[in-house]
Every structure is written in C-alpha cells, then in structure tokens.
C-alpha cells in the first residue's frame, strides 16, 4: 500500500463516534500506516481498535493507548475530537466552558510531549474558539493549527440539491461564513448552479425569496436537525478532515493566522 506519509498520526477522542470514524477514514484514505488512537475511556477505545483490526488493513501499525504521553510522543500530525459533544437543546456556545478547559490542557500536552508536531486539527466545538485556545497553549505557529467547521458549505450544497433536484456536481462554490454555529452567515454570491450564478436564480419562480430564506435556516440548523433526529453527529467529520486537507472543492480548513474565519 502507498501512503501519503509514514509519520505518526494521533487521533484524540478515538473512542467516540467521530474519532472512530476519523480513524477508519484515515486508514481507508491511506494517509499513514502509523496511527495511534487515544482516549481516556480505555474499554471503548479497545473496542474501536479491535473493530479496525478486523477490517484487515494491510501494512498498518495501528496502536491504542489511554496514556496521553504515549499517544502524543513522536506524533507529527494530530486530529482531536476529544471534547464534549453537543446534545439536544444545546448550542455550540453552550459547550464553551468545559471544552475550553479541555482545549487548554490539550495545548499544554502538545507543548510538553510533541513540540515538534507539524499540524494539529481541532474538531470539537465551538471549533473556532477551542482551536485558538489550543494554539495559544501549545505554543505553535498559527499555520500549524486548523479548526474544522467543514460541514456548513456542504450543507448549503445539499439543501440546494434537494430543492433544485439536480446533482451535487452541478452546484459549485458554496460558501458559508462566520462561526460554526447559529450565527453563521449563508451567502449566495459565490455559488453557481449549472454554470449560472445562484443570485440570478433567487427571487425568481425557480426559487422565490422566501424559499431561499427558509433554505438558509435549514443550513444554519443542519447540525441541530441531525441531533434532534439521531441524538448525535457521527460520520461527517472524519471524511471532512480528509477532504479539507486534500483541498476538496468548496471547503476550507482554516489556519488560525488571523485571515480566515470558519468557511
């Protein structure tokens, strides 16, 4: 098997649904053969590792540990979903106090155990804030820490697909701006539908203005809708991390360098 790198990737929060999905995605996409799974909840972590072993990925060195020093030592890449998850009735901002404390400790652990890490991706919400906290406490360069608000633009694309009844490949350059939360802004200005600007379609019989306003609300509340239906968000984040790092069209993993917001 040919991998993108042989350097160590550590997945923090690997016993959770998002973390375990990220681990499987990393293996499927052949990011690296050297993957370490970390979670403080050892029984569930072992269960995730066993499931991945049973997938029989060839040529991989998959390890797991509940010791943060062991997990981070030698890691060149880290992806963390190791914060508390949002539950029904909560906003991402409701998670701030607890997850800010987790992010601060995570940053301190990076500084202590893997100061030579090349890149860190922070997934847990509110991602723009927790990522900044990790950056400050880890002592890394802004370009070395990214946060992931990677679903909103695809949610916009998906809502347009459902509304217009056309393939996703015919809807490009979808963008959302601001925080990955209820206050995000959904714009039509960059989006093209079958080669035509979305702004020329809105407020026409094809998409009345009220329908566009309703569609924006569905995009903004997309995560809440899934939580209401399922109780949690599981699968999208892992694939989005991969897509972002590979430069997927319409998505951005944003370095915390002061220029980019959640896109």
Whereabouts are the PLM-identified features?
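N-terminal Rossmann-fold NAD(P) dinucleotide-binding loop
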Residues: 19-20
């Amino acid at each position: 098997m040919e991998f993108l790198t042989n350097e160590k990737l550590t997945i923090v929060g690997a016993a959770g649904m998002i973390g375990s999905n990220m681990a499987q995605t990393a293996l499927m996409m052949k990011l690296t053969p050297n993957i370490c799974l970390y979670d403080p909840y050892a029984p569930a972590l072992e269960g995730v590792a066993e499931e991945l072993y049973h997938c029989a990925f060839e040529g991989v060195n998959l390890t797991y540990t509940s010791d943060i020093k062991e997990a981070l030592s030698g890691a060149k890449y880290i992806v963390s979903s190791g914060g508390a998850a949002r539950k029904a009735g909560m906003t991402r901002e409701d998670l701030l106090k607890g997850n800010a404390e987790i992010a601060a400790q995570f940053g301190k652990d990076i500084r202590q155990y893997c100061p030579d890490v090349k890149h860190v991706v922070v997934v847990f919400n509110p991602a723009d804030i927790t990522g900044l906290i990790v950056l400050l406490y880890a002592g890394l360069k802004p370009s070395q820490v990214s946060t992931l608000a990677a679903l909103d633009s695809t949610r916009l694309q998906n809502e347009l697909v459902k509304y217009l009844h056309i393939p996703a490949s015919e809807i490009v350059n979808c963008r959302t701006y601001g925080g990955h939360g209820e206050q995000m802004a959904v714009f039509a200005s960059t989006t093209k539908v079958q080669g035509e600007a979305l702004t020329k379609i809105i407020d026409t019989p094809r998409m009345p203005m009220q329908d566009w306003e309703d569609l924006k609300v569905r995009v903004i509340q997309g995560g809440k809708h899934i939580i209401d239906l399922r109780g949690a968000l599981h699968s999208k984040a892992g694939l989005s991390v991969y897509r972002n790092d590979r430069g997927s069209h319409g998505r951005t993993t944003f370095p915390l360098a002061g220029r980019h917001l959640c896109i």
